[in-house]
UniProtKB/Swiss-Prot annotation:
The keyword 4Fe-4S does not apply. InterPro entries: Ribosomal_bL28/bL31-like_sf, Ribosomal_bL31, Ribosomal_bL31_B, Ribosomal_bL31_sf. GO terms for cellular component: ribonucleoprotein complex; ribosome. Keywords: Ribonucleoprotein, Ribosomal protein. It holds the Pfam family Ribosomal_L31. The lineage of its organism: Bacteria, Pseudomonadati, Pseudomonadota, Betaproteobacteria, Burkholderiales. GO terms for molecular function: structural constituent of ribosome. NCBIfam families: L31, PRK01678.1. This is Large ribosomal subunit protein bL31B. Part of the 50S ribosomal subunit. The gene is rpmE2. Belongs to the bacterial ribosomal protein bL31 family. Type B subfamily.
């Protein structure tokens, strides 16, 4: 393998924001946040859904608050880039 071209592959903590579940895995993801976990400091990645909170794995239906995202997007960007018909 060539030297200096591969990203840093390291231990990272992923935190499920819906239930505060944390787990360590290895990743090349870059993050500015860190967390103390099991007596050591690790980079932290916050995620919305993990196997601890996803209905497929838990067997329970859970409503995730995502309402209003489309409206928020439309309010922010309006009709920028939308196709309009040209009258001939």
């Amino acid at each position: 393998m060539k030297e200096g071209i591969h990203p840093d592959y390291r231990d990272v903590v992923f935190q499920d924001m819906s239930n505060d579940f944390k787990f360590i895995t290895r990743s090349t993801i870059q993050t500015r946040e860190t967390i103390e976990f099991e007596g050591a400091s690790y980079p932290l990645v916050k995620i919305e859904v993990s196997s601890e909170s996803h209905p497929f794995y838990t067997g329970k239906h859970k409503i995730v608050d995502t309402a209003g995202r489309v409206d928020k997007f439309r309010k922010k960007f309006g009709t920028v880039g939308s196709k309009t018909s040209v009258a001939e």
